[in-house]
Structure formats: structure tokens, C-alpha cells
């Protein structure tokens, strides 16, 4: 299921925290045969946090009915007959694992959340014939305000399992999520860098955004509110993002923003230009198809209100892309959106500091730091169409977390791995191979993709020393760089870390351990002849799947 075509639930989930659970057809995948995915799959929760007791809640919606699931995976609708005044919900808690222990429950087909709390149970209420009132801890009177808790979002249906870590509402207790495939491999995401949990708070407060941080009565940090909530309760100023939006609106009075919302449909484009206070977008035929009023700070941080994105194939995708460009502050620097180069995200001084820091502290750089962080596939989500099991690992608040399963997309820089020895083409896609342009072995000749031909420029020898060689030279990361977008070229073999590679047979990634990043086709899909090759954060996309 392409990230940019799925029905994103992020906006829905963010809205729910303030009021009532009314889940739409969120995270719905391409349907597979009904027999492909059983009614429940095992979910193992491991407690590496060093804290407890842990209480679990599996809450969500099935066929338009909201409810909860017990440890055996049985779904229970919330009681009906409730009026507009909220009443306590039945206790849906499941006893979680103690420190250093694991608990396995059954995860049913739902679109919802798995909550977990530390030390005490959470309070939930129902209203209006069985709708759930979610925690809204931006309100100091919320009964869960002083409880340490977090959650993961998931959808399990006939199309498989989608599960993600999220920071859309707040940054709090660290965790990883994972899915086991039929071949036994575990795809995972959400792991922080060493000491990343506290580093986030320190940097946030140092940047003047400390008003978002909520503390317990004993002074310990509980969470940092997402600015989408903080702006509405006066915890941060709107001045900086307002200034940025004004500059963006003025910039596009005299030039077009070109939105290409679907990576697999490069010919589908919309051009936008500002007229008065309205950003008006046209189709290829010149017809106006969407218009957005100049948004206030709440609309930008929350990707809603003035930037509301309906579940359609025109207005919604344009709104999502425009909001992502504003949140990541790339709208001024790149008129072609979405911006494919994450190295340029959050560089403006007026940027969303919360989102910037959330991505910085993730081991794989992926986060769900705002509602449409999935624009361009930068979200912390894993999916499999035939899931065998799901995992949540509650990580330590300090120190270094252990990667979930085989590491998946959270594999740490420097983790050793094998490179199968041999000689042959390095294939990508159906017809392309890694190629030395013009078969020229000159140092610093940047490698590319080219139609497979079997010539010497496409014959790569993989050594037991981790090198990949062609034409007597080594595949080399330019100047030992570690940043996204660093060129990969051929260079005289010298034994440095810039010339070492490992191969993950599960994800088909060629990874440079020194940088912790992967060999990547510049610009991503669609793959094409002449496309240059670079270093990029490992993301398991088509642009990083190499066949030896």
C-alpha cells in the first residue's frame, strides 16, 4: 500500500484526543483474500523500561462500532444508552508485563490504539451511545493529566497489519513496534538513539519551546505536547509560524507551487498560486480544483481547519502536501512538493522545532511528528500483508535500547552484518543495474542506474572484507560522508569505512555501517536509466532494494 495513497488516520487520531472516538476508514489497505489474515494475531509486549506495573488497553472500531478487546482478542462494544454527559467506561485494562518480562495477548481486527500506562490505570469515559472520550491531557483538568502513558496506532484487516509509533499528540514514554513476516523476519520502527528520550526534552527547552513540557507533581517529565495542542492552550507563540506562512503566501503570488502528490503517478500534478489570501490550485487542464485560505498557526501545526484534507484524490492530497511543506519549512526553498530531500527539512529558524527534534532522536530518522508526516514516507510505520505476529517493546528512558527483532529499519549504525561474497550484477527494479558511467574507472565517478547489459561496468565483486568492487575500484561514500544525499562513487580501494558494505537479505538493503545509511537511488521511484546513486536513511523503499 503506497504511503501517499493510503487513507491517513493521523488527522483523525489527533482530533480524537480532544473529544470522541469516531474512527473513519483509517489506514485501510488494499484488500487481500479474507483467509490471508486470521481474526486475531499474537501481540507480544516486552517491558524493557525498568518500570511498572504496566496496564494495557486495546481500543478501536470495527464495522462502525467502537469498543475494546480483552487479552484473548474478543471484541466488546462499549455500552449503549449513554447520553451527552460522559460516564465511566468499563475497565478494559489488561495486566501488562513486569520489568524485564513479556506478555502475549491476541490482537483483533480493528482500527484503533493500544494504550499502555505506567504505575496506575487510565480513566476512560463513554458518551452518546457508546462513543469513547479519549484522553486530552492538554487540558489540566483531564483525569489522565498526571499519568505517564503512551500508545501505538494500528489497523489489522484483510489487507494485513499497519502499526506505527506516534508523536502526533505528544512525546512521551519511548517504545518500538514491529511486525513479523511469514519468512520470520521482523520489521520494526520507533527506536530512539542512545539517551534520545531526555535529549529531546533538553533540546526542546533549550530552543524556547519548554512550555510544551508537562511534569508530574514530583517534577518528573511526563510528556511534551505536540504544538498542534500546545498552540491551542497558549503554551507556545504563533508568531514564528505566522511569519513563515506570510512569507510563503507572498512568495507564491508570482510563482507556482507544483504539487505531485503520488510518487507512482508522476504525471498527476497540480499548480498553485496565491490570489489575495487564497492559495488556489489548478489541474493540468487549468481548472481550479482546490483553494486554501491563509492558515493560522493551529491549522498548520494540526494540518486541519484551514488546511483540512478530505479523504478524496484531489483536495486531500494537495492539502496534505501543502501542510507538510509548511510544517517542514520547505515551501520557500522548493516550489516542487513534496520535497524529496529530507536534508532540507526543518532548516528555517521558524520551523516546527518539536517535529525536527522528534526525527533527530529516532535511530532511523522516521517519526510521526505531525498529522501528515507520511507525505514522502517519513513516518514511523511498518506494514505486512501476511502478518504472523505484532510486537510492542517499552524501551528504557535512559541509555541505549535493544533493537526489536532483527533490528529492521531501526538497526543501529555500526551493527555488523554480512556481505555475501561473489561477482555479478547489483540489480534494482526489474531492468536496472548499478553501473559505472561510461565504464570510466576514474576516482570520484558517481555511480548510477542503467539498463542491465552484463558489461564490465556492471560486474561487481563482493569481498569478504565488505568491499564492493568494479573496474578495479571500490564503491565509496564520497569523503566518508554520513548525511542524506551524500554521493556514492568509485574510488581507489583504501580500506576505510567509507568502502564497507553489508547486505540485509530481508529488506534487500546495502548498508554502509560507518554512516548507518543505505545505498539509494537519488529521488526514489520511479526508477530510471541514468539515475544517480547516493547515501540515504534506510527506509525499505523500492529505491533501496538491491538483488545480488
From Swiss-Prot:
<feature type="active site" description="Proton acceptor">
    <location>
        <position position="169"/>
    </location>
</feature>
<keyword id="KW-0574">Periplasm</keyword>
<dbReference type="InterPro" id="IPR037176">
    <property type="entry name" value="Osmotin/thaumatin-like_sf"/>
</dbReference>
<keyword id="KW-0430">Lectin</keyword>
<dbReference type="InterPro" id="IPR032477">
    <property type="entry name" value="Glyco_hydro_64"/>
</dbReference>
<dbReference type="GO" id="GO:0071555">
    <property type="term" value="P:cell wall organization"/>
</dbReference>
<protein>
    <recommendedName>
        <fullName>Glucan endo-1,3-beta-glucosidase</fullName>
        <ecNumber>3.2.1.39</ecNumber>
    </recommendedName>
</protein>
<dbReference type="GO" id="GO:0042597">
    <property type="term" value="C:periplasmic space"/>
</dbReference>
<feature type="active site" description="Proton donor">
    <location>
        <position position="153"/>
    </location>
</feature>
<keyword id="KW-0732">Signal</keyword>
<feature type="region of interest" description="Possesses beta-glucanase activity, but is unable to lyse viable cells">
    <location>
        <begin position="37"/>
        <end position="430"/>
    </location>
</feature>
<dbReference type="GO" id="GO:0042973">
    <property type="term" value="F:glucan endo-1,3-beta-D-glucosidase activity"/>
</dbReference>
<comment type="function">
    <text>Lysis of cellular walls containing beta-1,3-glucans. Implicated in the defense against fungal pathogens.</text>
</comment>
<dbReference type="GO" id="GO:0030246">
    <property type="term" value="F:carbohydrate binding"/>
</dbReference>
<dbReference type="InterPro" id="IPR042517">
    <property type="entry name" value="Glyco_hydro_64_N_2"/>
</dbReference>
<dbReference type="InterPro" id="IPR035992">
    <property type="entry name" value="Ricin_B-like_lectins"/>
</dbReference>
<keyword id="KW-0378">Hydrolase</keyword>
<feature type="signal peptide" description="Tat-type signal">
    <location>
        <begin position="1"/>
        <end position="36"/>
    </location>
</feature>
<keyword id="KW-0326">Glycosidase</keyword>
<dbReference type="Pfam" id="PF16483">
    <property type="entry name" value="Glyco_hydro_64"/>
</dbReference>
<dbReference type="InterPro" id="IPR037398">
    <property type="entry name" value="Glyco_hydro_64_fam"/>
</dbReference>
<keyword id="KW-0961">Cell wall biogenesis/degradation</keyword>
<dbReference type="Pfam" id="PF00652">
    <property type="entry name" value="Ricin_B_lectin"/>
</dbReference>
<dbReference type="InterPro" id="IPR000772">
    <property type="entry name" value="Ricin_B_lectin"/>
</dbReference>
<feature type="domain" description="Ricin B-type lectin">
    <location>
        <begin position="422"/>
        <end position="548"/>
    </location>
</feature>
<feature type="region of interest" description="Essential for the lytic activity, but not for the beta-glucanase function">
    <location>
        <begin position="472"/>
        <end position="548"/>
    </location>
</feature>
<dbReference type="InterPro" id="IPR006311">
    <property type="entry name" value="TAT_signal"/>
</dbReference>
<feature type="domain" description="GH64">
    <location>
        <begin position="38"/>
        <end position="396"/>
    </location>
</feature>
<comment type="similarity">
    <text>Belongs to the glycosyl hydrolase 64 family.</text>
</comment>
Amino acid at each position: 500500500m503506497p504511503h501517499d495513497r493510503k487513507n491517513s488516520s493521523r488527522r483523525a487520531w489527533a482530533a480524537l484526543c480532544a473529544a470522541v472516538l469516531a474512527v473513519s476508514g483509517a489506514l485501510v489497505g488494499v484488500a487481500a483474500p479474507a483467509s490471508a489474515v486470521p481474526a486475531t494475531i499474537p501481540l507480544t509486549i516486552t517491558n524493557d523500561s525498568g518500570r511498572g506495573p504496566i496496564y494495557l488497553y486495546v481500543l478501536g472500531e470495527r464495522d462502525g462500532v467502537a469498543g475494546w478487546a480483552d487479552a484473548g482478542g474478543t471484541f466488546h462494544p462499549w455500552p449503549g444508552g449513554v447520553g451527552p454527559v460522559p460516564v465511566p467506561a468499563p475497565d478494559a485494562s489488561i495486566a501488562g508485563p513486569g520489568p524485564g518480562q513479556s506478555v502475549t495477548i491476541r490482537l483483533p481486527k480493528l482500527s484503533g490504539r493500544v494504550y499502555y500506562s505506567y504505575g496506575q490505570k487510565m480513566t476512560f469515559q463513554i458518551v452518546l451511545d457508546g462513543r469513547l472520550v479519549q484522553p486530552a491531557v492538554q487540558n489540566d483538568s483531564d483525569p489522565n493529566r498526571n499519568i505517564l502513558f503512551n500508545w501505538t496506532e494500528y489497523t489489522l484487516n484483510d489487507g494485513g497489519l499497519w502499526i506505527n509509533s506516534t508523536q502526533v499528540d505528544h512525546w512521551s514514554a519511548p517504545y518500538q513496534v514491529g511486525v513479523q513476516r511469514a519468512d520470520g523476519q521482523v520489521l520494526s520502527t520507533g527506536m530512539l538513539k542512545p539517551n534520545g528520550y531526555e535529549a529531546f526534552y533538553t533540546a526542546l527547552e533549550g530552543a524556547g519551546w519548554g512550555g510544551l513540557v508537562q511534569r508530574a507533581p514530583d517534577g518528573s517529565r511526563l510528556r511534551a505536547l505536540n504544538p498542534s495542542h500546545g498552540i491551542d492552550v497558549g503554551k507556545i507563540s504563533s508568531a514564528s509560524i505566522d511569519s513563515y506562512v506570510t512569507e510563503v503566501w507572498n512568495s507564491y503570488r508570482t510563482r507556482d507551487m507544483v504539487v505531485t502528490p503520488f510518487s507512482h503517478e508522476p504525471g498527476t500534478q497540480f499548480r498553485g498560486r496565491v490570489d489575495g489570501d487564497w492559495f488556489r490550485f489548478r489541474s493540468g487542464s487549468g481548472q481550479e480544483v482546490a483553494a486554501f485560505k491563509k492558515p493560522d498557526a493551529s491549522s498548520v501545526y494540526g494540518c486541519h481547519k484551514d488546511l483540512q484534507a478530505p479523504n478524496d484524490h484531489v483536495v486531500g492530497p494537495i492539502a496534505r502536501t501543502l501542510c507538510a511543506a509548511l510544517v517542514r519549512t520547505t515551501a520557500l526553498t522548493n516550489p516542487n512538493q513534496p520535497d524529496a530531500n529530507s536534508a532540507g527539512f526543518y532548516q528555517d529558524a521558524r520551523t516546527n522545532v518539536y517535529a525536527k527534534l522528534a526525527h533527530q532522536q529516532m535511530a532511523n530518522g522516521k517519526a510521526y511528528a505531525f498529522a501528515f508526516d507520511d507525505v514522502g514516507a517519513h513516518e514511523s510505520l511498518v506494514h505486512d500483508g501476511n502478518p504472523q505476529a505484532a510486537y510492542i517493546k517499552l524501551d528504557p528512558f535512559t541509555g541505549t535500547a535493544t533493537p526489536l527483532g532483527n533490528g529492521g529499519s531501526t538497526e543501529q549504525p555500526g551493527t555488523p552484518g554480512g556481505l555475501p561474497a561473489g561477482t555479478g550484477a547489483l540489480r534494482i527494479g526489474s531492468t536496472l543495474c548499478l553501473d559505472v558511467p561510461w565504464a570510466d574507472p576514474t576516482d570520484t565517478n558517481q555511480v548510477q542506474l542503467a539498463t542491465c547489459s552484463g558489461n564490465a561496468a556492471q560486474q561487481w565483486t563482493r569481498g569478504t572484507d565488505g568491499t564492493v568492487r568494479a573496474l578495479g575500484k571500490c564503491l565509496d561514500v564520497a569523503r566518508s560522508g554520513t548525511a542524506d544525499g551524500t554521493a556514492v562513487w568509485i574510488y581507489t580501494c583504501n580500506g576505510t569505512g567509507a568502502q564497507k558494505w553489508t547486505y540485509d537479505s530481508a529488506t534487500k538493503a546495502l548498508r554502509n555501517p560507518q554512516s548507518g545509511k543505505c545505498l539509494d537511488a537519488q529521488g526514489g521511484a520511479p526508477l530510471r536509466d541514468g539515475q544517480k546513486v547516493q547515501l540515504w536513511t534506510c527506509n525499505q523503499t523500492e529505491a533501496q532494494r538491491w538483488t545480488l
